[in-house]
């Protein structure tokens, strides 16, 4: 099988690594340049989408912010999975909210803002405090504001109005502020025949809006809620592939915060922690192969490497530590790679995270240090 991935970043790279043992070949299409490249070496393989489509069996995507003309071409080929509808919903908060409502899953109360009058209505409908998010283009904490009191209204409106004016069809989605205890996510896969497999929930810690630490957890009640909502969304979309749902945990009740119609950062732990990783299961699904087991095989955490292109040699020497570099040029705050940390028995994972805190810079890895302080207290 030959799969074309829309996007030439680290997710396409890791799909390529997962596909090789299954004899699944991956090419990556750079939606900005129009180049078709090898996802590991970035060696140029060709140019132009239509020609690339002719030579592959399946088309999929590694991110949701894809120009609609490209999506239309891929959808018309009959080879694109999950679907242009799913990708669009992941890239537009208005469509995402409509999808969640249609699927009947809990999400924060919201109101769509396009004008100053809409902002006034949103304040009445949603209330203060509220979180405001750009409908298009926002990710990793970008394009977001928080309205805490009425004194901020005019200042925030000026910023939001500029955001709306800068991009055609842009809007702001106002959401009620949710006083959650923690953020969790569920990664799952749905096959062509409708079979569904989900991984254990992961608890996620964000720093400045960017995922820093993700740990697989055992929470049967939350797992059941999450799987029910995952199934509702996946079946509403007739989804094929890996899908991620991010949740707020509010006193033991889950609310969907976001969906991602693709393999996801909070699922990278599955590379070492699950029977079948998310990248392999995505390829299995879109290629019409049986889904692999999502069973947890060892306790695992994933640590994002942000803005760093080297690590102390002692990290590689530590038992249970697996480093995954993305081959990117160093840039402040950029996702450069991740570390999967595993433990085979209770407490071993936690002790290894504490050991990592002793050698990793606190400024670059704040969540690991915060975890260590709490664990050792």
UniProtKB/Swiss-Prot annotation:
Which pathway does this chain act in?
Purine metabolism; IMP biosynthesis via de novo pathway; 5-amino-1-(5-phospho-D-ribosyl)imidazole-4-carboxylate from 5-amino-1-(5-phospho-D-ribosyl)imidazole (N5-CAIR route): step 1/2
Spell out the molecular function terms from Gene Ontology.
Answer: 5-(carboxyamino)imidazole ribonucleotide synthase activity; ATP binding; metal ion binding; phosphoribosylaminoimidazole carboxylase activity
**GO BP terms in the entry:** 'de novo' IMP biosynthetic process
Q: Which Pfam families match?
A: ATP-grasp, PurK_C, RS_preATP-grasp-like
Known PROSITE patterns for this protein?
ATP_GRASP
Q: What is its EC number?
A: 6.3.4.18
* UniProt cross-references to HAMAP family, sorted A to Z: PurK
Q: According to its UniProt record, which protein family does this protein belong to?
A: Belongs to the PurK/PurT family.
Task: Spell out the protein name for this chain.
Answer: N5-carboxyaminoimidazole ribonucleotide synthase
- The gene for this chain is purK
């Amino acid at each position: 099988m030959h799969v074309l991935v829309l996007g030439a970043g680290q997710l396409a790279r890791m799909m390529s690594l997962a596909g090789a043992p299954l004899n699944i070949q991956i090419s990556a299409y750079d939606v900005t340049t129009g180049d078709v490249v090898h996802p590991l070496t970035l060696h140029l393989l060709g140019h132009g989408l239509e020609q690339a489509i002719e030579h592959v069996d399946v088309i999929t995507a590694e991110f949701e912010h894809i120009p609609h003309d490209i999506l239309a071409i891929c959808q018309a080929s009959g080879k694109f999975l999950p679907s242009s509808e799913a990708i669009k919903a992941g890239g537009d908060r208005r469509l995402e909210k409509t999808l969640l409502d249609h699927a009947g899953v809990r999400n924060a109360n919201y109101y769509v803002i396009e004008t100053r009058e809409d902002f006034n209505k949103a304040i009445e409908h949603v209330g203060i405090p509220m979180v405001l998010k750009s409908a298009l283009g926002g990710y990793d904490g970008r394009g977001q504001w928080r309205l805490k009191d009425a004194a901020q209204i005019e200042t925030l409106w000026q910023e939001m109005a500029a955001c709306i004016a800068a991009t055609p069809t842009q809007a702001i989605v106002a959401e009620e502020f949710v006083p959650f205890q923690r953020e969790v996510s569920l990664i799952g896969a749905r096959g062509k025949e409708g079979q569904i497999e989900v991984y254990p929930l992961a608890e996620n810690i964000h720093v400045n809006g960017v995922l820093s630490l993700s740990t697989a957890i055992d929470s049967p009640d939350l797992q059941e809620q999450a799987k029910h909502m995952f199934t509702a969304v996946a079946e509403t979309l007739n989804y094929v592939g890996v899908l991620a749902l991010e949740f707020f945990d509010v006193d033991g009740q889950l609310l969907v915060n976001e969906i991602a119609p693709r393999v996801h950062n909070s699922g990278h732990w599955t590379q070492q922690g699950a029977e079948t990783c998310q990248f392999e299961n995505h390829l299995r699904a879109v290629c019409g192969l049986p889904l692999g087991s999502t069973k947890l095989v060892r306790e695992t955490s994933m640590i994002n490497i942000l803005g760093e292109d080297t690590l102390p040699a002692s990290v590689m020497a530590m038992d249970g530590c697996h480093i995954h570099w993305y081959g990117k040029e160093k840039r402040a705050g950029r996702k450069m790679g991740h570390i999967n940390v595993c433990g085979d028995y209770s407490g071993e994972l936690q002790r290894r995270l504490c050991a990592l805190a002793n050698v990793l810079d606190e400024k670059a890895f704040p969540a690991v240090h915060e975890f260590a302080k709490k664990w050792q207290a």
